[in-house]
Amino acid sequence: MTSPASPSSTAEPTPDPDRPTEPGPAALFDAIVAEHAAIYGYGLVSPHVMPDDNELVSKALAEHRDRREAAVALLDERSVKVPLPAVGYQLPIVVDSPSSAAKLAVQMESDCAVAWRAVLEQTDIEQDRSFGGTALTQCAVMAARWRRVLGAWPVTEAFPGGSE
């Protein structure tokens, strides 16, 4: 997972004091954090993919940006403070080849799917549930496209965003 970078390798990131305490808004807040991380991560994926996959990077980046902005608007409508992007992120792997770039893309899509599934599980607001379902589906489809780039099988997951 791409996570906010900490000052030392043993320190855990400090929880955001602006994170809502209610489960629904908190899950949406966390999904925005995941979207920020994915946007950052695709900036590292882009220079390492094969030229044939540049369009996939562009599409993924546009989806994450659009999704983040729409989710920010949902929190804004409720006067909930939105998370800011971290100044840097700790990557789960070194990205130095087309293969490692695609693996990071799969991981980021999976991380976002987990976050959007949590929105579905935690909120009772119909607008958020609908948005979360669409977001989860988009992340699952994008992860499948990246798994295909890797030649992985199967390319899909039965229950995206979960450990089933």
For each feature predicted by the language model, list its residue ranges:
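All-alpha RGS (Regulator of G-protein Signaling) helical domain and cognate RGS-like helical scaffolds
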Residues: 1-164
